[in-house]
Amino acid sequence: IYTLSLHDALPIWISSIGYSLCNHFADADFSSSLPYIRRITEQVLEHGLPLGICLNVNFPDTASLKGVRICRQTNGAWINEWKRSLHPRGGEYFWLTGEFDNYEPEAEDSDHWALGHGYVAVTPTQIDVTAYGMMNELKNWNLEV
C-alpha cells in the first residue's frame, strides 16, 4: 500500500480521499490546507470517483501553498522504516519512522517533487500492482509444460 492514510479504504473498494499534512506533531497547523480540503471534497462530491479510486492528498508543511499538482507517486523506498513500540493498554504497534529514499528527485510529475516545491500533491491511487510492462515479455517466454 502506497500510503497509510488510504490503508483501510482500499481493501474493500471504497472510493475515498485521504488528507495528510507533512507535519506529524499534535499541534500541526492545518489552517492553510482547509480551503483546499473543502474545494477538493466539493469537487469529488460533484464529479464522483470511480469505484476503488482513492485520492491521496498531501500538503507541504507551509502556510504559503502554491496551488495543486496532480501527481503520480514517486519512485523510491523507505529506509529504516519501522519502529516497534508497546501500546500503553497492551500489545505492540509499529510506527513509520524511516527516511524516504527518492530515486527520482527531479521528476516534476511526482508527489514528492510537488510537496518539496510548496504544492498540494493530489495522487489518484488504486489497488493494481500488475507490472503491465512485463506482461508482453512474459508472453515470449517458454512457460508451457
Task: List each language-model region with its residue ranges.
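Single conserved hydrophobic/aromatic residue that forms the stacking wall/gate
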Residues: 1-8
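Glycine-rich phosphate/pyrophosphate-binding loops
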Residues: 11-32
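Electrostatically charged, flexible surface regions
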Residues: 30-145
